[in-house]
Amino acid sequence: MSTEVSPLQSNAYAVNVKTGKRRLIGNKDGMHHVQLSGSGNYVIDNYTSFTIPRNIEIVPTSGKEKTVSLLTATNPMEAYNMPEITVGTLKAADGKTDLYYRLIKPVNFDPNKKYPAVVYVYGGPHAQLIHNNRNYDARGWDIYMAQLGYVMLTVDNRGSDNRGLEFENCTFRQLGTEEMKDQVKGVDFLKSLGYVDNNRIGVHGWSFGGFMTTNLMLTYPELFKVGVAGGLSSTGLTTK
């Protein structure tokens, strides 16, 4: 499995151990979860993307036979009034690293209105909140808040998963510092949007995200109207 196509994806490859050449197996789009057959000749490829609710296919590893479809799911949210969900990049606090963000606009969005905003944060190691999955991994709560009229922003800051060792190791011996700087860049991005009410920006997270919420509120109180910290991590990870 590899993130070669995009850090937001997981794709399967076949590798020739003699030549080192590799070949993509299956659809290029989306997050793929594969199971290899005992013979090694096929994989069951279970995948989703922002535009694909779910496909399950039998894919030959040789690349010479046809793929067989087992399931093509319909969009379960098709009948609902869904918010606009987009993914983009912004620069990290180091001025050079691209960070991925997910932005959800309120349902029935009016660019002439001013909307309150919530930054949903995790920010810790071994986690990534944004993938090329259905709704870019936005949860039901994110969508519910958009239905209530909130702009929702999530940023995968430096120190989070699937971007390589250098990206994750920037927080070594300074956990909670570099992550906050990147989240502040996310707030700066929010404040640059003409439809966001800069006086009504909140922050919320659970576990390491609860730690980040508390830390952000105490370090940058001028940026946030309110913070809601859930399930704070109280281990040596965040207290030393």
Positions of the model-derived regions?
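Short loop/turn segments that connect beta-strands within beta-propeller blades
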Residues: 16-20, 61-63
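Surface loop/turn motifs at the tips and blade-to-blade linkers of beta-strand repeat domains
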Residues: 25-29
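Serine-hydrolase catalytic core recognition
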Residues: 31-240
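Repetitive beta-architecture junctions, highlighting loop-to-beta-strand starts
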Residues: 8-12, 20, 54, 99
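Short glycine/acidic-enriched loop and turn motifs that connect beta-strands
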Residues: 3-7, 49-52
